[in-house]
């Protein structure tokens, strides 16, 4: 049993330490995998060894591509923001996110504006004025951690109304928070739709209480309590596959 990430990763390191198993190098390794070996896959899309990968390589590849992600979620009737694959179909008076990098994360490759302000791109999603944003971590069809994005109190920069991330002064919190009752099942259904064994599902809620899935991360951040919760859940998953 090994952990392998798509690039050097503190989260993969933390997971390997919790599981007390070795990590595989992202570039070179003397490890020769066998079909009976299990590799805990942390965002890797390329088969390096002839082994059993958790998560499946193709599922991780699909989750990494924003177009493929939205198409699979739509096919499974998972609620997502209105999606366009051509600039010509956008409505002139609406605000959209243009995804210039289909494999970006943490706001990378996102441009916001009305159609005349946006570049040509392979994917556009309609802006939804969100009231809340959540992250639900799913492992083996169970939600093992729920968090909500909150404004960091001592942040002194300008907050973006569009992208809520650390750079814009937002942090995750889980204590003393009331979560929408349908949130866990939505996260599970979204993970199943992409055939993932585990993932961090980012979900927003609009002012009317509607929930929308934005993406599913397969190499998400791990620290503190999250490492413990995810690590124990993946340990159980490994034991089921041995």
Where would I find each of the regions flagged by the language model?
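ATP-dependent carboxylate/phosphate-activation module, predominantly the ATP-grasp catalytic core
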Residues: 119-193, 217-237
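Conserved protein kinase catalytic core
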Residues: 105, 208, 221-224
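Active-site nucleotide/adenylate-binding loops and adjacent lid/helix of ATP-dependent enzymes
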Residues: 1-16, 29-35, 42-147, 177-184, ...
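Short helix-loop-beta junction
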Residues: 16-23
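Short secondary-structure junctions
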Residues: 76-79, 193-197
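A short glycine-rich, hydrophobically flanked beta-strand micro-motif that places a catalytic Asp/Glu
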Residues: 196-208
């Amino acid at each position: 049993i090994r952990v392998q990430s798509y690039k050097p990763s503190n989260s993969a390191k933390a997971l390997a330490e919790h599981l007390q198993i070795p990590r595989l190098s992202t570039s070179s390794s003397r490890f020769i995998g066998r079909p009976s070996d299990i590799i805990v896959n942390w965002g890797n899309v390329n088969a390096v060894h002839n082994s059993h990968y958790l998560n499946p390589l193709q599922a991780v590849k699909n989750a990494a591509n924003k177009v493929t992600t939205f198409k699979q979620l739509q096919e499974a009737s998972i609620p997502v923001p209105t999606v366009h694959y051509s600039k010509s179909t956008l409505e002139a008076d609406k605000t959209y996110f243009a995804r210039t990098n289909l494999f970006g994360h943490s706001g990378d490759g996102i441009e916001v504006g009305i159609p005349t302000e946006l570049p040509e791109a392979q994917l556009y999603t309609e802006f939804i004025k969100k009231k809340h944003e959540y992250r639900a971590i799913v492992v083996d069809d169970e939600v093992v951690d729920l968090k909500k994005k909150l404004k960091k109190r001592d942040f002194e920069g300008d907050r973006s109304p569009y992208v809520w991330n650390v750079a814009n002064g937002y942090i995750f919190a889980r204590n003393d928070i009331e979560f929408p009752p349908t949130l866990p099942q939505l996260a599970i259904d979204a993970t199943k739709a992409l055939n993932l064994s585990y993932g961090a599902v980012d979900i927003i809620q609009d002012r009317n209480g509607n929930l929308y899935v934005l993406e599913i991360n397969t190499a998400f951040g791990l620290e503190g309590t999250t490492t413990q919760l995810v690590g124990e859940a993946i340990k159980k998953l490994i034991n089921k596959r041995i």
